[in-house]
């Protein structure tokens, strides 16, 4: 199963900005690795939450469309809420 998500670069950093994103149904994430700088992004929470239910989400290469540019990544780390079925943050590593 091929996964493809639309993402936007986020400029606001910090705890307050991340909480506002989560309250609006989005999830903060970061893309790093390769020869490029790390990029902070924001994704739709519901799309990612549904996709992460599949086992292949963790092993396959995922395509992120960041401002019109496709980036191939793999999930490096994922933080979940302690008792709610919500994602808190995701780290992606360029494939």
From Swiss-Prot:
Please give the biological process terms from Gene Ontology that the record holds: translation
For this entry, the protein name equals Large ribosomal subunit protein bL25
Which InterPro entries is this protein grouped with?
A: Rbsml_bL25/Gln-tRNA_synth_N, Ribosomal_bL25/Gln-tRNA_synth, Ribosomal_bL25_short, Ribosomal_L25_dom, Ribosomal_uL5_bac-type
Q: Which Gene3D superfamilies match?
A: Ribosomal Protein L25, Chain P
Q: Which UniProt keywords apply?
A: Ribonucleoprotein, Ribosomal protein, RNA-binding, rRNA-binding
Self-association or partners: how does it assemble? Part of the 50S ribosomal subunit; part of the 5S rRNA/L5/L18/L25 subcomplex. Contacts the 5S rRNA. Binds to the 5S rRNA independently of L5 and L18.
Stated role: This is one of the proteins that binds to the 5S RNA in the ribosome where it forms part of the central protuberance.
- Name the protein family: Belongs to the bacterial ribosomal protein bL25 family.
The record's GO molecular-function terms, alphabetically, read: 5S rRNA binding; structural constituent of ribosome
- What species does this protein belong to? Mannheimia succiniciproducens (strain KCTC 0769BP / MBEL55E)
Entry GO CC: cytosolic large ribosomal subunit
């Amino acid at each position: 199963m091929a996964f493809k998500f639309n993402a936007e670069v986020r400029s606001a950093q910090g705890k307050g900005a991340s909480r506002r994103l989560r309250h609006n149904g989005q999830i903060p994430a970061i893309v790093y690795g390769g020869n490029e700088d790390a990029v902070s992004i924001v994704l739709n929470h519901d799309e990612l939450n549904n996709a992460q239910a599949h086992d292949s989400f963790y092993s396959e290469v995922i395509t992120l469309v960041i401002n019109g540019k496709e980036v191939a990544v793999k999930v490096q780390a994922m933080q979940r809420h302690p008792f709610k079925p919500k994602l808190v943050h995701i780290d992606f590593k360029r494939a």
